[in-house]
From Swiss-Prot:
Protein name: Outer-membrane lipoprotein carrier protein
Native source species: Shewanella frigidimarina (strain NCIMB 400)
Signal sequence region: 1-23
Summary of subunit composition and partner proteins: Monomer.
Gene Ontology biological-process annotations: lipoprotein localization to outer membrane; lipoprotein transport
The keyword Protein transport is assigned to this record: yes
Localization, UniProt: Periplasm
Length: 214
């Protein structure tokens, strides 16, 4: 009996220690993100399948600003645009001539990447964060939803000191999208309009905002 109690105690202690470490990791990641009031960068993208076979490469421009502002413009190989203006998230596919719009709060459920500009305590509580050291200069944080609500099952974000340098997305099919950032800087005052989206003429609009359903 004493041996069983000892084993259970060790398991409980290990579990509590692991939970505390993950909480500390989440706190550290949020502290790093809170120091980024805005960021503008170019990115290169590489997508591989579950067998590490290349599927696609691409490039574009990425920007974010607190609170809840996000800009993602894929320019190669096919253009697409994602803009979060603080209240709404707009997804524009020029080829399909279609715009999807949803609440920013829904964006976090659609992809944990939205956590980069989201600082709500209740939202972060839905995710587990684990820190891992990649090298002497780089530190990565793995983010996983505690309950899967989207096709993105894992996100990792990597820093060199306080600079965000790359992030990866893994979907439920096992495809890995890797994004490397370069030319990082703050968003300039005269660039603030990149977080505003004007709906183009002659496009279909799929309005998924929650207020539309009420």
């Amino acid at each position: 009996m004493n041996k069983r109690i000892t084993v259970l105690s060790l398991l409980l202690a290990t579990s509590l220690s692991s939970a505390a470490a993950m909480a500390d990791d989440a706190t550290e990641l949020r502290a790093k993100l809170s120091n980024i009031d805005s960021l503008h960068a170019t990115f290169s993208q590489q997508v591989t399948d579950i067998n590490s076979k290349p599927i696609q490469t691409g490039s574009g421009v990425f920007a974010l600003a607190y609170p809840n502002q996000f800009y993602w413009h894929l320019t190669q190989p096919d253009e697409s645009l994602i803009v979060a203006d603080g209240a709404n998230l707009w997804i524009y596919n020029p080829f399909a001539e279609e715009v999807t719009v949803m609440d920013v709060a829904q964006a976090v459920d659609a992809s944990p990447m939205a956590l980069l500009v989201h600082r709500d305590e209740a939202t972060w509580a839905k995710y587990s964060v684990t820190k891992r050291a990649v090298s002497g200069k780089s530190t990565c944080f793995d983010i996983q939803p505690k309950k899967l609500n989207s096709n993105v099952v894992a996100v990792s974000v990597c820093f060199e000191a306080s600079q965000l340098v790359k992030f990866n997305l893994t979907d439920e099919q096992g495809n890995l999208s890797q994004f490397a950032l370069t030319q990082q800087r703050k968003v300039k005052d005269n660039e603030a309009n990149i977080f505003k989206f004007a709906v183009p003429d002659n496009v279909d609009i799929d309005d998924q905002r929650l207020k539309q359903a009420n």
